[in-house]
Amino acid sequence: MPGAVEGPRWKQAEDIRDIYDFRDVLGTGAFSEVILAEDKRTQKLVAIKCIAKKALEGKEGSMENEIAVLHKIKHPNIVALDDIYESGGHLYLIMQLVSGGELFDRIVEKGFYTERDASRLIFQVLDAVKYLHDLGIVHRDLKPENLLYYSLDEDSKIMISDFGLSKMEDPGSVLSTACGTPGYVAPEVLAQKPYSKAVDCWSIGVIAYILLCGYPPFYDENDAKLFEQILKAEYEFDSPYWDDISDSAKDFIRHLMEKDPEKRFTCEQALQHPWIAGDTALDKNIHQSVSEQIKKNFAKSKWKQAFNATAVVRHMRKLQLGTSQEGQGQTGSHGELLTPTAGGPAAGCCCRDCCVEPGSELPPAPPPSSRAMD
């Protein structure tokens, strides 16, 4: 691995298992595995991103970019890079573990959910993304699956994860690589035009839309038609799903989901909008409608997300049950670690004695089954 990345020197480790106990597979990527592990010295739980060097041939720049981005970030709503280890065949990124589960799961589990709850969530995302933008970092893949709760506490903060597609901007530069998740990418990305930080603001608008109704603003079984909708910024606030949502919330979304990136709100402008900074977000309970739509449109079997946050949640709940129950084998639904999905770790993952095979990424997630369901 070239050593051009800024930051502390990578620590050497012949066998990472001498330092950490591996507990579970949390996810797989194109050339990495994410493992739930425990520091043998401190008993602290962490997420370790294990990257096989042989899978990085020709991709060193991409990996170094991600590490460079992570090294610069210190924000309470962004998953932190704690340490880096290197062995002969692997690179290990020791990441802060977030154990509160996924955004959609928490909303569905709630008995009460309001516009104000959504506003507080979006405030945290905006504040974190503004911080990134001030550092010259564009995330480029903001979506609900990358928003995780820090802990199981009811008032837990939200955390932004997954910086695999993030990019450092040079002053005055524009980006041009088409990347991101189709339903959340800005029109200028699909149009293959040069783009900037404004793409993240568009994605936040899409997330806000979903948080208030439970379904995506753009949907079609045909990708070409889906892209056409996004390119034209054609979306609606459908009745009856939006009947109880404030005009202020809709105005906020319109400013973020603005087709013209020059007219689109920046994070700073969005943070000053009355729906975020003022008192216009309603307190009416919209849980039933939103949770029903989330369950219909974002079923777990369709997400196929690369990060198994459920495994972390179950592990944390197991710890909360206490050692006496564990000793009696009373695991129950909350006290049992998930087994690795799809029949076990991906072939060649770092929790075995070999390396990740190049290009062994998960298939892309299919679109939701319906844009809005009765």
Swiss-Prot record:
Regulation of activity: Activated by Ca(2+)/calmodulin. Binding of calmodulin results in conformational change that relieves intrasteric autoinhibition and allows phosphorylation of Thr-177 within the activation loop by CaMKK1 or CaMKK2. Phosphorylation of Thr-177 results in several fold increase in total activity. Unlike CaMK4, is unable to exhibit autonomous activity after Ca(2+)/calmodulin activation.
Name of the protein described by the UniProt record: Calcium/calmodulin-dependent protein kinase type 1
Cross-link type Glycyl lysine isopeptide (Lys-Gly) (interchain with G-Cter in ubiquitin), residue numbers: K59
Subunit comment: Monomer. Interacts with XPO1.
Location(s) in or outside the cell: Cytoplasm; Nucleus
Main location: cytoplasm
GO molecular function: ATP binding; calcium/calmodulin-dependent protein kinase activity; calmodulin binding; protein serine kinase activity
Region of interest (Autoinhibitory domain), residue spans: 276-316
Catalytic residues identified in the record: D141
Tissue expression pattern: Ubiquitous.
Organism, as annotated: Mus musculus (Mouse)
